[in-house]
Amino acid sequence: MISKEQKQKIITEFGKNPNDTGSVEVQIALITDRIRYLTEHLKSNKKDHSSKRGLLKLVGQRRSLLRYYQKKNLEAYRTLIAKLGLRK
């Protein structure tokens, strides 16, 4: 799971201030980090179906947030996906 320090690092990197946990950029970055963690977990635990279901829910949540952010601010969306290393 994501540690407190790692979470705070992501918040300071993507947020507007250190207490900015609700902005779209921070939410997408945190979900992306959790998705990366779960994909590594599922590589070694192939039969963990509940984690796989949770991963699919996170991917759907991130997709909807990305769609919203793309409509809201296209340039910031492009820089965000480049920063996170997402394909598109």
UniProtKB/Swiss-Prot annotation:
Q: Which GO terms describe its molecular function?
A: rRNA binding; structural constituent of ribosome
Question: What role is this protein assigned?
Answer: One of the primary rRNA binding proteins, it binds directly to 16S rRNA where it helps nucleate assembly of the platform of the 30S subunit by binding and bridging several RNA helices of the 16S rRNA.
Q: So which domain of life are we looking at?
A: Bacteria
Per the record, GO CC terms? cytosolic small ribosomal subunit
InterPro entries membership? Ribosomal_uS15, Ribosomal_uS15_bac-type, uS15_NS1_RNA-bd_sf
Q: Which HAMAP family match?
A: Ribosomal_uS15_B (MF_01343_B)
* Quaternary state and interactors: Part of the 30S ribosomal subunit. Forms a bridge to the 50S subunit in the 70S ribosome, contacting the 23S rRNA.
Q: What is this protein called?
A: Small ribosomal subunit protein uS15
Gene Ontology biological-process entries = translation
What is the gene called?
rpsO
Q: Which family does it belong to?
A: Belongs to the universal ribosomal protein uS15 family.
Organism (species): Borrelia hermsii (strain HS1 / DAH)
Could you tell me the keywords of this UniProt record?
A: Ribonucleoprotein, Ribosomal protein, RNA-binding, rRNA-binding
